[in-house]
């Protein structure tokens, strides 16, 4: 599953293995390397010397000549895995017996072969491990028993030798082997059989010639020369000519071009067309299963379904498994099949399909402490007499179909039900389909028991699902072996994606970082708690490395077939791995290995002669008997092994002179004739595999061979890495230069947009707008039952079962209830732009998040669907690739769920984060009355908003409301909502630069109400933790920030102060404030606030550009309503500034509440600088920014659509600096954009030096920047966190006061939740995810990883530093919060260091966190200030643009970020993201108001035109952002300048000059002439 590095060679090596001097006196000899092609090693892959043992695992066997010779032609596969790099090479081996003459004393030693000595492989530079082998025939072997142990003193060898009598002919095992990076097992096997046939035919031709050589010797001569037993000089020139032509054939085969996945196939002619069809080599694209060129269902047939699933359970749960068999082929194929069947998981431990018996110390690998899967021949343990099998290894005997458990094995957990029953049914049905009966079997249980099988003419009547289209029935796709293999893999994927196994897996993963490699934390506790039924299997599976790695792999998967299966696509024509299903779509490359002028054609045309002494090396179509590894004449396996042990096989790695492998001729002498090119448009002849009738590929734009250019090459130039005999020497006989084959693999560019129906019909539409190419959509109801996968291009509404043809506009989304918002949205103008200072805090994000989490059990929001970038569409798959950037992740974490909570639709393994849109039933079908659910959620939020409003007015929660509040706060969604309204923290621009979060003074009545709400929230968090954190617990960061920053003062005069006296106190005037009003608030993740903001340093803020930030779909309407309500807001603001000294400080919150209620219809509330009068003298007012309003629970702001809520569902999607509580977990989502840049962090000094001030720690001192306040301040302030800790004050008055503020339903003591370390870990992981979302670090991980890999070292380091800073900031705040709640300091150290190691934080930031931990003993309570997160400092601008040159184009929203430009669709989903390094040029025309952007798209330049009224502002906004991005790269060496001066010379006059290339054009300067005379041609 790991993406393999491209290899420019189709074949690496072709070797011949056997005994150079076969002996009839021993049953086995040490195998030797007889011949290798090429002679030189490839630099990255030297030929492993151990390959000889893998080719002949039990040694080079010698047997007596037998008449039944054809049965001994066998083939098998083995693998070689590099221990350092993990790269796997495949060996395809054909073993056969060739006869040799028993030496007579008077006979000369053939040709002086003796001096050549023993032979072995070249020096091995690669650490190779493991291989597979297997014979094609399937002999059975009884399990080894005590009585089958080898008896060295007694064997049948002497008896057989006595019976031989006068016969002197014997046979020796010979191996032809191909080593390759590519698993083309069947086609490579055909190549080897063809090579063997060529040598055999040359031997047969000798029989008809009078060469003066005895007939028996003639038959052996060709092989003896070919294997190096005879010297060439001693034989006739005819033999030499034949062998040279055979070697030329081998060299041409080694030069074969390589197929490109999803693009090109290679058709190789190994023999003339009239003798054999061309062999097709093709690789599937990533949307299909990976190529498995062997019968995947083989273990199911050998072991049966039940035993096979038992072995799979052992493998999945990381037990040691050893398979054994006498059949090499069955052994190796079974091991590889088990590994392939666990897809999409990947086996993370050693896999050795065949471990040779005769290899020295091979048994030591079985002592490895890690899990493994190893296949061994049946003779392995009998041969290794002194080896004792470990007592924790499961032994699988394929010959006896038994699974033998180890002595101390733990009981394997049973697979969960009903998933296991469903899986068994599917597997049995797949196997049954290969029987002679072509109709589906009605009762699989009776079939399995061998009873009478009733057949059903149509579909099974007992369908498990109500929708016929979703019934899994692989039989409808054919009963051939390849279709059964696909059905088997589909069944396994569906099993893993079932509710009790891994469904919804990605909901419980938290991405900690992407660079330099992804690090993902898997929350196993919440995952297991979300299972409908708790099973031991799921519990153990969740703890395996395969599942842990799956969380990282799924961020950027190398294969997408599992996602298509989740969308109910099972057709092998769409997901199958065999070339017969897709080869016709690929561009053919024709390559000919066979030379038409070769005399081998004459040999091939000679009919083979057979006599009573027929040679066992002749080929035939099938084996007549089971292959028994040449030991069929032995009465038991023990007899055979005893003979092997007598032979004294040397199993050590050979080290021999490479000259002994010398070829007969040089590769440079190979003559290559050009293949006649096909006529243009001519369809190449189909090969035998593709000529059969297959189901047509249901594609709207499939590329066929006839429509693609047909590249015809005869041979490819070898790469520099190839051997000299293949590339270094000039070939004199080559008639034409060979066209080079590109060595680099291009990613698949299949551009299919398929709409699958039951009849295979194709629905295709044309789209003039390039921004809405067919990508995704929702099928109509009438097509639902037949729909296999949806490729509809638009977000379409379904009316009466037909597709809507009109694109959705912001005003075309119908709201949940009647309101003026809909009409206002329809009448609004889209040509306005909005700017956003995203300096708000956690609460803004939390309030934004809460709007997304309604109806979590129904269909997901359109705002979660993000259009893929154009580059992603071009390089990925033909099925919909909807990357759910950003918003959906928050939905997943905060969605309330619990054990047994029924979800409307099952979630896929990748759930809503999948890069594929959900299948039609998931998107369209909703439980009854969606309006009712939406209204209910809105009512709950409205109720809580009134409660919060009452608390901020000093009226408290209310006795009657307490019970309902506690019940509602059990939802993380509503916790986030309430905390976002409670937080009154304000952070000015000066505070942001100084990394300061100011304390907030509240009245005593407000304190009481807020404390009650916080305690209710803590109780709800206890419930969430009891359910393993389901729904998320990131809200604790927001809660503790409020608790640490909000206080009331006991002094009456302080209660009458204006809030600005506290909020805006300059740092340094109060000796007790260093960097913040309160030392603890500094580390808190800020939460947006409803209250006013402190004024910026300039008093105006960033208002130069009149660009405001788009926050939601109904943004257009909100801009109009802002103008409409501007005066009303101003009047209400003026009313609130009346001097009321005795009024509680934050009665000001009422103004904001009324403002937000007033703007509920529009969803956006604005505070403009134009409405500031003398209000500024009373309270601090922020610059003109969008204030996150609290109308998100309004009924009118809930969109009712088949897709759920859109981006504009709530007004809280708009961003602002101060609307709710600031907590770490939600600050980053303040701006609700779905594709923010990964580096949109303010790069000023305050941000980059976020740890600069607070960590200048000294022994026994408080951290710098967090000094203790004066005793007067501390003694007069009562913070909310003190109430959370219980009555810990000394005075009786304090205790009485606390008792009076407690309610009967709330605990007065410190919660035990604070002592649960797992709670803090889960909260940290949730907070990291939310912060990353807000900063755009997780939006489109595939694209961001690709971009990271394309950047220079400096930019890579910057991105890594951004992630380190984020993690270190949250860890710092975590320490602060744990100190605040009096957690044991030793536990703090252990947990934080564990999280720091899990996060892979860099050295600089980890050292800063360690400094805090080192000073932990001297810190208490609020001594450690909290830090503001990076998402507080993010800024971006959004512009409304039209595609094209006028307003007739579709509306898009262009966001200008720090390092990219994001283009959103009209409903807020991300369509494109253009990194600045990809932009080539940018111009604008003030007259036409058109902006032109040129960008690099692969090797092409693409022009995009946009019309916008703010054309000039957009141009300069992008220009400034690009300049800032370029400033970050000053340390990078500049690239090549466009243009320059080049010395030239006039060829006519010889005069020298300069050629100047500039952006304006080309200029020529000579000493005497400044102009050149141009002649007309």
UniProtKB/Swiss-Prot annotation:
Phosphothreonine: residues carrying this PTM: 1060, 1065, 1235
Where, by tissue, is this protein expressed? Expressed in the brain.
Q: Which GO terms describe its molecular function?
A: guanyl-nucleotide exchange factor activity
Where does this polypeptide localize? Cell membrane; Cytoplasm; Cell projection, Axon
Query: Where is the sequence biased in composition, kind Low complexity?
Result: 123-140, 699-715, 826-839, 928-938, 1189-1203
* Basic and acidic residues bias locations: 106-121, 1127-1141
In its UniProt entry, what is this protein called?
MAP kinase-activating death domain protein
PANTHER family named in the record: MAP KINASE-ACTIVATING DEATH DOMAIN PROTEIN, MAP-KINASE ACTIVATING DEATH DOMAIN PROTEIN MADD /DENN/AEX-3 C.ELEGANS
Its assembly, as annotated, is: Interacts (via death domain) with TNFRSF1A (via death domain). Interacts with PIDD1. Interacts with YWHAZ. Interacts (via death domain) with KIF1B; links the motor KIF1B to Rab3-carrying vesicles in anterograde synaptic vesicle transport. Interacts with KIF1A. Interacts (via uDENN domain) with RAB3A, RAB3B, RAB3C and RAB3D; the GTP-bound form of the Rab proteins is preferred for interaction.
Query: What's a GO biological-process term for it?
Result: anterograde synaptic vesicle transport
What are the residue boundaries of the cDENN domain, all occurrences included? 288-428
Ranges of compositional bias, category Polar residues? 141-156, 688-698, 793-803, 1157-1172, 1232-1248
Sorted alphabetically, which keywords does the UniProt record give? Apoptosis, Cell membrane, Cell projection, Cytoplasm, Guanine-nucleotide releasing factor, Membrane, Phosphoprotein
Using the record, list the residue span of the signal peptide; answer none if the entry has no such feature: none
Q: Where is the composition biased (Acidic residues)?
A: 614-629
Q: Which parts of this chain are annotated as the region Disordered?
A: 106-166, 604-635, 676-840, 912-940, 1050-1109, 1127-1272
Reply yes or no: does the keyword Cell membrane apply.
yes
Q: Which organism is it from?
A: Mus musculus (Mouse)
**Chief location bin:** membrane
Effect of deleting the gene: Apparently normal in utero development but immediate death after birth, probably due acute respiratory failure. Absent GDP/GTP exchange activity of Rab3A. Apparently normal development of the central nervous system during embryonic stages. At 18.5 dpc, no evoked action potentials of the diaphragm and gastrocnemius muscles in response to electrical stimulation of the phrenic and sciatic nerves, respectively. In contrast, axonal conduction of the spinal cord and the phrenic nerve are not impaired.
Looking at the record, the residues that make up the dDENN domain are 430-564
């Amino acid at each position: 599953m790991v993406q393999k590095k491209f290899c420019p060679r189709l074949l690496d090596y072709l070797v011949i293995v056997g005994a150079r001097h076969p002996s009839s006196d021993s049953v086995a000899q040490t195998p030797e390397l007889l011949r290798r092609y090429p002679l030189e090693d490839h630099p990255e892959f030297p030929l492993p010397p151990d390959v000889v043992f893998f080719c002949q695992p039990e040694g080079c066997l010698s047997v007596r000549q037998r008449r039944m010779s054809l049965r001994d032609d066998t083939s098998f596969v083995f693998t070689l895995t590099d221990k350092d790099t993990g790269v796997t090479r495949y060996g395809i081996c054909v073993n056969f017996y060739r006869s040799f003459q028993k030496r007579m004393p008077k006979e000369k030693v053939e040709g002086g072969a003796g001096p050549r000595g023993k032979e072995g492989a070249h020096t091995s530079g690669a650490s190779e491990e493991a291989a597979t082998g297997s014979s094609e025939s399937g002999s059975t072997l009884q399990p080894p028993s005590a009585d089958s142990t080898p008896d060295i003193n007694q064997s049948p060898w002497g008896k057989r030798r006595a019976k031989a009598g006068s016969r002197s002919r014997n046979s020796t095992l010979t191996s032809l082997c191909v080593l390759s990076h590519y698993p083309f097992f069947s086609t490579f096997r055909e190549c080897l059989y063809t090579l063997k046939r060529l040598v055999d035919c040359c031997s047969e031709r000798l029989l008809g010639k009078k060469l003066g050589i005895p007939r028996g010797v003639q038959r052996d001569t060709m092989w003896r020369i070919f294997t190096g037993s005879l010297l060439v000089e001693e034989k006739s020139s005819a033999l030499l000519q034949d062998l040279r032509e055979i070697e030329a054939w081998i060299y041409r085969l080694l030069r074969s071009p390589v197929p490109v996945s999803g693009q090109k196939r290679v058709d190789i002619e190994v023999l003339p067309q009239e003798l054999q069809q061309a062999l097709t080599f093709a690789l599937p694209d990533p949307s299909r299963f990976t190529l498995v060129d062997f019968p995947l269902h083989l273990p199911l047939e050998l072991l049966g379904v039940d035993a096979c699933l038992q072995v799979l359970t052992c493998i999945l749960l990381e037990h040691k498994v050893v398979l054994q068999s006498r059949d090499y082929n069955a052994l190796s194929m079974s091991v590889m099949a088990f590994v392939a069947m666990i897809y999409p998981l990947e086996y993370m431990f050693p896999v050795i399909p065949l471990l040779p018996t005769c290899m020295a110390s091979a048994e030591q690998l079985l002592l490895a402490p890690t899990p493994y899967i190893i296949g061994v021949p049946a003779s392995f343990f009998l041969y290794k007499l002194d080896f004792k099998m470990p007592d924790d290894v499961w032994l699988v005997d394929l010959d006896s179909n038994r699974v033998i458990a180890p002595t101390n094995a733990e009981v394997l957990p049973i697979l969960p039900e009903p998933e296991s029953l469903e899986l068994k049914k599917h597997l049995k049905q797949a196997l049954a389909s290969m029987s002679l009966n072509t109709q589906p079997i009605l009762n699989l249980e009776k079939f399995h028991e061998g009873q009478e099988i009733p057949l059903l003419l149509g579909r099974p009547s007992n369908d498990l699902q109500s929708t016929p289209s979703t019934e899994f029935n692989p039989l409808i796709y054919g009963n051939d072996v390849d279709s059964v293999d696909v059905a088997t893999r589909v069944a396994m994927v569906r099993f893993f994606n079932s509710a009790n196994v891994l469904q919804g897996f990605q909901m419980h993963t938290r991405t900690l970082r992407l660079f330099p490699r992804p690090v993902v934390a898997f929350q196993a506790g919440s995952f297991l708690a979300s299972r409908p039924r708790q099973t031991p299997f799921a519990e153990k599976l969740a703890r395996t490395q395969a599942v842990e790695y799956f969380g990282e792999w799924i961020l950027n998967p190398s294969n997408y077939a599992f996602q298509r299966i989740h969308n109910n696509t099972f057709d092998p024509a769409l997901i199958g791995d065999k070339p017969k299903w897709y080869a016709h779509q690929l561009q053919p490359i024709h390559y000919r290995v066979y030379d038409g002028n070769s005399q081998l054609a004459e040999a091939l045309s000679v009919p083979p002669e057979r006599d009573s002494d027929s040679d066992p090396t002749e080929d035939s179509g099938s084996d007549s008997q089971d292959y028994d590894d040449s030991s069929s004449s032995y009465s038991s396996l023990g007899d055979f092994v005893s003979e092997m042990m007598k032979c004294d096989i040397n199993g050590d790695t050979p080290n021999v002179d490479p000259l002994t492998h010398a070829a007969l001729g040089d590769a440079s002498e190979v003559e290559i004739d050009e293949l006649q090119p096909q006529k243009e448009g001519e369809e190449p002849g189909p090969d035998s595999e593709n000529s059969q009738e297959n189901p047509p590929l249901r594609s709207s734009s499939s590329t066929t061979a006839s429509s693609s250019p047909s590249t015809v090459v005869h041979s490819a130039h070898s790469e520099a890495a190839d051997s000299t005999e293949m590339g270094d020497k000039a070939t004199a006989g080559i008639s034409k230069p060979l066209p080079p084959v590109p060595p680099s693999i291009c990613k698949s560019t299949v551009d299919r947009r398929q709409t699958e129906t039951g009849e295979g019909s194709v629905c295709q539409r044309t789209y003039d707008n390039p921004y809405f190419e067919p990508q995704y959509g929702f099928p109509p109801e009438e097509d639902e039952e037949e729909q296999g996968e949806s490729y509809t291009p638009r977000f379409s509404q379904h009316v009466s079962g037909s597709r809507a043809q009109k694109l959705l506009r912001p005003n075309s989304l119908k709201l949940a209830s009647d309101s003026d918002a809909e009409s206002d949205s329809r009448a609004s103008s889209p040509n306005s732009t909005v700017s956003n200072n995203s300096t708000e805090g956690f609460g803004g994000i939390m309030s934004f998040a809460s709007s997304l989490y309604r109806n979590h059990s129904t269909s997901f929001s359109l705002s979660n669907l993000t259009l893929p970038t154009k580059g992603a569409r071009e390089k990925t798959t033909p099925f919909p690739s909807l990357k759910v950037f950003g918003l959906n992740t928050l939905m997943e974490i905060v969605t309330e769920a619990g054990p047994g909570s029924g979800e409307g639709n099952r979630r896929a393994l990748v759930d809503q984060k999948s890069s594929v849109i959900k299948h039609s039933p998931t998107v369209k079908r909703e439980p009854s009355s969606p309006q009712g659910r939406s209204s209910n959620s809105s009512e709950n939020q409205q109720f809580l908003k009134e409660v919060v409003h009452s608390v901020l007015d000093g009226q408290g929660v209310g006795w009657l409301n307490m019970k309902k509040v506690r019940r509602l706060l059990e939802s993380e969604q509503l916790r986030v909502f309430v905390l976002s309204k409670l937080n009154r923290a304000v952070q000015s621009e000066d505070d942001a630069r100084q990394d300061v979060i100011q304390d907030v003074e509240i009245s005593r009545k407000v304190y009481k109400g807020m404390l009650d709400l916080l305690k209710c929230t803590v109780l709800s968090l206890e419930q969430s933790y009891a359910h393993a954190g389901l729904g998320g617990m990131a809200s604790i960061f927001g809660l503790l920030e409020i608790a640490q920053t909000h206080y009331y003062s006991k002094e009456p005069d302080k209660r009458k102060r204006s809030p600005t006296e506290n909020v805006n106190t300059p740092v340094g005037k109060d000796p007790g404030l260093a960097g913040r009003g309160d030392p603890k608030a500094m580390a808190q993740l800020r939460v947006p606030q409803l209250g006013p903001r402190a004024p910026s340093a300039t008093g105006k803020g960033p208002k130069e550009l009149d660009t405001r930030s788009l926050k939601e779909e109904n943004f257009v309407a909100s801009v109009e309503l802002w103008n409409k309500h501007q005066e009303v807001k101003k009047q209400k603001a003026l009313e609130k500034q009346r001097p009321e000294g005795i009024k509680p400080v934050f009665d000001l919150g009422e103004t904001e509440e009324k403002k937000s209620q007033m703007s509920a219809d529009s969803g956006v509330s604005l505070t403009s600088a134009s409405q500031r009068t003398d209000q500024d003298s009373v309270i601090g007012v922020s610059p003109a920014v969008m204030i996150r309003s609290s109308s998100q629970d309004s009924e009118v702001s809930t969109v009712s659509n088949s897709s759920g809520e859109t981006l504009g569902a709530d007004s809280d999607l708009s961003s602002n600096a101060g609307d709710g509580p600031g907590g770490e977990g939600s600050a980053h989502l303040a701006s609700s954009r779905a594709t923010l840049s990964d580096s949109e962090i303010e790069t000023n000094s305050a941000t980059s030096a976020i740890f600069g001030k607070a960590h200048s720690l000294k022994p026994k001192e408080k951290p710098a920047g967090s000094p203790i306040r004066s005793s007067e301040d501390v003694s007069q302030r009562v913070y909310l966190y003190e109430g959370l800790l219980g009555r810990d004050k000394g005075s009786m008055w304090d205790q009485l006061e606390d008792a009076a503020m407690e309610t009967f339903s709330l605990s007065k003591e410190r919660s035990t939740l604070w002592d649960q370390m797992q709670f803090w870990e889960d909260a940290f992981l949730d907070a990291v995810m939310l912060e990353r979302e807000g900063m755009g670090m997780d939006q489109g991980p595939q694209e961001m990883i690709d971009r990271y890999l394309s950047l220079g070292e400096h930019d890579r380091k910057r991105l890594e530093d951004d992630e380190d800073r984020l993690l270190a900031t949250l860890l710092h705040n975590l320490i602060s919060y744990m100190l605040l709640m009096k957690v044991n300091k030793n536990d703090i150290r252990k947990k934080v260091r564990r999280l720091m190691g899990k996060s892979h934080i860099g050295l600089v930031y980890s050292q800063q966190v360690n400094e805090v931990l080192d000073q932990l003993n001297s810190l208490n309570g609020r001594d450690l200030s909290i830090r503001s997160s990076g998402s507080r400092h993010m800024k971006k601008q959004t512009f409304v643009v039209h595609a094209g040159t006028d307003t007739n184009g579709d509306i898009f929203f262009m966001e200008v970020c720090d390092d990219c430009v994001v283009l959103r669709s009209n409903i807020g989903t991300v369509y494109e993201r253009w990194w600045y390094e990809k932009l080539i040029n940018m111009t604008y025309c003030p007259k036409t108001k058109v902006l032109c952007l040129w960008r690099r798209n692969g090797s092409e330049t693409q022009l995009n035109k946009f019309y916008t009224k703010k054309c000039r502002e957009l141009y300069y906004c992008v220009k400034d952002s690009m300049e800032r991005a370029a400033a970050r790269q000053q340390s990078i060496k500049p690239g090549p300048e466009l243009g320059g001066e080049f010395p030239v010379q006039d060829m006519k006059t010889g005069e020298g000059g300069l050629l100047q290339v500039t952006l304006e054009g080309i200029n020529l300067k000579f000493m005497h002439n400044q102009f050149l005379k141009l002649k007309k041609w």
